[in-house]
Amino acid sequence: MKIHHLNCGCMCPLGGAFYDGFSKGLHAHLVCHCLLIETERDGLVLVDTGFGQGDVREPSRLSGFFRVLNNIQRRESLTARARVEALGFSVADVRHIILTHLDFDHAGGLTDFPHARIHLMQQEIDTAQQRHSWLQRERYRPGQWSATSGWEGYQVQGERWFGFDAVTALNGLPPEILLVPLAGHTPGHAGIAIQQPQGWLLHGGDAWFYRDEMRQPQRHCT
């Protein structure tokens, strides 16, 4: 399987290195890191979707609070759809989307791929639909995903894998792609593991924000 690393959105909040760990100026620079996986028989698989075309054209889909706080850079050229098409593929080639979680900067592109099956933890679906707290109402934006279909929710169950519990394969996808529950950043947050010839790649979503968080003697993850 070939994996493309895509930046599908940009946010530049005030705070510099205090926010992202490395920026030199007043503003931090955060990317929406997505993966595009080319499979042999199951088409393209997109891991997270960043911001979508709807977010660029209709800013009201996003929380006004987070638009200001995160200084979201709305650029159509950075959407997952634009990135996929720039690689020579079509929207229809994306047959599966796997979400680490449903935050606005990860789920915004769902409506740009209307025929894709959507895989994520069932707990995340339930939490996003209920939106009990103010923060949940700001971070989970139904306008980004309420019109989509083909959702597949997964329970916390499965096999032990490299010290992680309840890791599971995904329906309709090769066994080299696994869903890894990583609750914390959100109740139904998950990582996506992809087996490659040289080893495993784990997309951790927002379980950590900066690579040095995983290099310190005492690791700090969200």
PLM features: residue spans?
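Conserved beta-strand hairpin/beta-sheet module of binuclear metal-dependent hydrolase folds
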Residues: K2, C10-A82, I192-G205
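Active-site metal-binding motif and surrounding structural segment of the metallo-beta-lactamase
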Residues: S60-L120
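Short hydrophobic/aromatic-enriched beta-strand-loop microsegments
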Residues: R117-Q122, H203-G205
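Active-site metal-binding loops of divalent metal-dependent hydrolases
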Residues: G9, T49-G52, L102, E124, ...
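A hydrophobic, small-residue-rich beta->alpha segment in the mid-to-C-terminal subdomain
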Residues: G204-T222
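Metallo-beta-lactamase
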Residues: I72-F89, D93, Q122-P181
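Active-site environment of divalent metal-dependent phosphoester hydrolases
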Residues: L14, L102-A107, T186-H189, F209-D212
